[in-house]
Curated annotation (Swiss-Prot):
GO molecular function: D-tyrosyl-tRNA(Tyr) deacylase activity; Gly-tRNA(Ala) deacylase activity; Ser(Gly)-tRNA(Ala) hydrolase activity; tRNA binding
Protein's recorded name: D-aminoacyl-tRNA deacylase
GO cellular component, as recorded: cytoplasm
Sorted UniProt keywords: Cytoplasm, Hydrolase, RNA-binding, tRNA-binding
Taxonomic placement: Bacteria, Pseudomonadati, Thermodesulfobacteriota, Desulfovibrionia, Desulfovibrionales
Gene giving rise to this polypeptide: dtd
Family according to the record: Belongs to the DTD family.
Source species: Solidesulfovibrio magneticus (strain ATCC 700980 / DSM 13731 / RS-1) (Desulfovibrio magneticus)
């Protein structure tokens, strides 16, 4: 699982011109699942560890302006948006290959499980895009602060 984490002042997702989800200050996270993740990945330690890392990253300023607070501590929102292109390979040619991404039916189950786990950890503070939809994602970056998390770096499968 790969996450592109962006600290935002606000973010929203729309599909076909209709608002689907929005948050005020918090994190907008683009989420991709790899072919090696497998359908049982969400139930395993790597997925949970990556989610915990995300929720506990100290990337919000304290009273002194030091990046010392996590999303949990600030009470901010979390907006999760599926994006299989995080597994694009540009090694050959000019057209990206997406063969390293999880198949859509597997990724959908993993994405839904991740959204559910995040919702349990942050009740009432999690929004999500529409899996597989062509979405319009709007955000106001704060900082900017952008971090890449990969479950493989945290002991995960991919």
């Amino acid at each position: 699982m790969r996450l592109v984490v962006q600290r935002v002042r606000e973010a929203s997702v729309a599909v076909d011109g209709q608002a689907v989800a929005s948050i005020e200050a918090g994190l907008l996270v683009l989420v991709g699942f790899g072919a090696a993740d497998g359908s049982d990945f969400a139930a395993g330690k790597p997925c949970r560890a990556t989610l915990e890392k995300l929720l506990d990253l100290r990337i919000f300023p304290d009273e002194a302006g030091k990046l010392n607070l996590s999303l949990r501590e600030t009470g901010g929102g979390l907006l999760l948006v599926s994006q299989f292109t995080l597994y694009a390979s540009c090694r050959k040619g000019r057209r990206p290959s997406f063969s390293e991404a999880a198949p859509p039916q597997v990724a959908l189950g993993l994405y839904n499980a991740l959204v559910e786990m995040a919702g349990q950890a942050l009740p009432g503070r999690v929004g999500s895009g529409v899996f597989g939809a062509d979405m319009d994602v709007s955000l106001v970056n704060w900082g900017p602060v952008t971090i890449l998390l990969d479950s493989a770096d945290l002991g995960g499968a991919t």
